[in-house]
C-alpha cells in the first residue's frame, strides 16, 4: 500500500503509561521504513519526554485511540506541535487473539501511515470549555430532578399526597406546606391555609391529601433533600452565568439557532457546544447528521437495504435535539410540525421525532455555512409540493366508498 504520511506515530493510551510507535523513513535512500516503540509514563513529565522524542523524529501526524478520558492530556499536549487524530476504536479492529498494547500502537501507526482511518471531531479549546460547562449543567439539572423524585417518593411513603393536588410541589405553595411540615406542623387544616388562593378552592381535597403520618424521621430526610435541590439550583445559576460569558464570542450562531421552531436559548447553547461554530469541520450536512447519529445506518446486503438503526452518535447532542423536536412538533403552522404529522401516522412517534431531529440538524448546517436565519416553509408546504394530488385521490375515494359520485371542477382564481 502507498504511504500517505511519511512521518507518523500511533499511541496506545492507558491509565499508567502510553505506548508510542513511530513510522519514519529508513536511514538510507531506498531502505525499508523504520518503526520503533517506546513506553512513557502517563505523568506530565513522561508526556513531555514523549513530545520531545516525536518532535526530534520529525513526526507530523499522530493517531491515538479514544480511551475514556486518558487521551485528553496526550491530545492537548501535542495538538499545538503536530496534527493529532482521535480515532474510533470500532474503525480499527486488529486481528483477534494477538492483542497487546505494543501491537495496538504499531497497528494504529500503520493505519495512519497508509491513511486508512478518519479522525474524529475534536473541537477547539473555547468550544471544549463551553462543552464542559453545558454538559456539567445537564448533569446538575438531572441530579436535581432525581432528588425531587426522591422527595416525592418520601412524601408517598408517609401518606402525604401533595403531588396529587399541587402541580408543582416545589413551587411557592408546595414549599410553604413542606417547610411547615418539616418545622413540626402536622394539622392538615393549618397546612392547607398556606396554599395559594387558587388552591384554597380545593381546600377539602387538600386537607385530605395532607393527612398522613409525617414523622421527625421524614422531616430530617425531607429537609436534606430540599437542601440538595436548592444547592443544585444555585449551582445551575452559577453555570448559566459562566456559560453566558463563554458563549459571548459566538452570539451570532446562538441568534441563528434561536430562529428555528422548538429551539430555545438553552437548547441553542448545548447545540453550539456540541457541534462548534466552525461548520466547515463537517464537509456536508449529511456528514453532520451521520456524526450526530440522527440518520439510519447503511446496511445493504444481497441487493437489499433493510431499515437500519441510527448510530450511537453524540448522546448529548441527540438528547437536546430530541427536546427541540418535541417542542417543534407542537408548534402551529410550521414545516417541522407538518412533517411530524405526515410521518407519525405511518412510521410511529419515535421515528417521526428522529426525522425531525435530522431536519433540524440539516437546517443548522446550511444556516451556519451561509450565515442565514431559518426560513420556515409553512405548514402547507407538503400539501402544496407533493400532497395535493394524493389528498385529492384519498378524499374522492372516501366519498366513493360512502356512495357519492364526485365530479371535480377547478375553482377559477379571482
Region locations from a protein language model:
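A detector of single, family-specific signature residues
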Residues: 1-414
Amino acid at each position: 500500500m502507498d504511504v500517505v504520511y511519511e512521518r507518523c506515530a500511533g499511541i496506545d493510551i492507558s491509565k499508567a503509561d502510553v505506548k508510542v510507535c513511530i513510522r519514519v523513513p529508513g536511514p538510507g535512500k531506498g531502505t525499508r521504513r523504520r518503526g520503533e516503540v517506546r513506553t512513557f509514563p502517563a505523568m506530565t513529565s513522561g508526556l513531555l519526554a514523549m513530545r520531545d522524542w516525536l518532535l526530534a523524529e520529525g513526526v507530523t501526524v499522530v493517531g491515538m485511540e479514544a480511551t475514556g478520558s486518558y487521551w485528553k492530556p496526550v491530545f492537548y499536549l501535542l495538538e499545538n506541535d503536530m496534527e493529532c487524530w482521535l480515532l474510533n476504536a470500532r474503525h480499527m479492529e486488529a486481528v483477534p487473539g494477538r492483542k497487546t498494547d505494543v501491537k495496538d500502537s504499531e497497528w494504529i501507526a500503520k493505519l495512519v501511515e497508509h491513511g486508512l482511518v478518519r479522525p474524529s471531531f475534536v473541537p477547539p479549546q473555547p468550544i471544549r470549555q463551553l462543552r464542559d460547562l453545558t454538559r456539567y449543567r445537564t448533569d446538575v439539572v438531572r441530579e436535581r430532578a432525581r432528588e425531587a423524585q426522591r422527595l416525592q417518593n418520601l412524601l408517598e411513603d408517609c401518606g402525604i399526597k401533595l403531588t396529587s393536588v399541587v402541580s408543582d410541589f416545589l413551587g411557592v405553595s408546595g414549599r410553604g406546606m413542606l417547610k411547615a411540615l418539616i418545622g413540626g406542623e402536622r394539622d392538615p387544616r393549618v397546612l392547607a391555609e398556606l396554599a395559594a388562593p387558587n388552591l384554597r378552592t380545593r381546600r377539602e381535597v387538600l386537607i385530605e391529601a395532607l393527612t398522613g403520618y409525617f414523622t421527625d424521621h421524614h422531616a430530617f430526610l425531607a429537609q436534606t433533600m430540599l437542601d440538595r435541590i436548592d444547592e443544585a439550583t444555585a449551582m445551575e445559576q452559577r453555570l448559566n452565568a459562566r456559560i453566558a460569558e463563554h458563549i459571548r464570542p459566538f452570539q451570532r450562531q446562538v441568534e441563528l439557532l434561536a430562529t428555528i421552531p422548538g429551539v430555545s436559548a438553552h437548547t441553542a447553547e448545548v447545540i453550539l457546544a456540541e457541534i462548534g461554530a466552525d461548520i466547515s469541520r463537517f464537509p456536508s450536512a449529511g456528514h453532520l447528521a451521520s456524526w450526530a447519529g440522527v440518520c439510519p445506518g447503511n446496511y445493504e446486503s444481497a441487493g437489499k437495504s433493510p431499515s437500519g438503526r441510527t448510530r450511537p452518535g453524540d448522546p448529548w447532542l441527540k438528547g437536546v435535539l430530541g427536546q427541540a423536536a418535541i417542542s417543534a412538533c407542537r408548534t402551529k403552522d410550521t414545516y417541522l410540525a407538518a412533517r411530524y404529522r405526515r410521518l407519525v401516522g405511518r412510521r410511529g412517534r419515535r421515528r417521526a421525532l428522529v426525522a425531525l431531529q435530522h431536519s433540524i440538524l440539516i437546517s443548522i448546517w446550511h444556516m451556519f455555512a451561509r450565515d442565514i436565519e431559518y426560513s420556515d416553509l409553512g405548514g402547507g408546504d407538503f400539501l402544496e409540493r407533493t400532497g395535493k394530488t394524493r389528498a385529492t385521490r384519498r378524499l374522492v375515494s372516501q366519498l366513493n366508498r360512502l356512495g357519492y359520485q364526485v365530479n371535480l371542477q377547478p375553482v377559477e382564481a379571482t
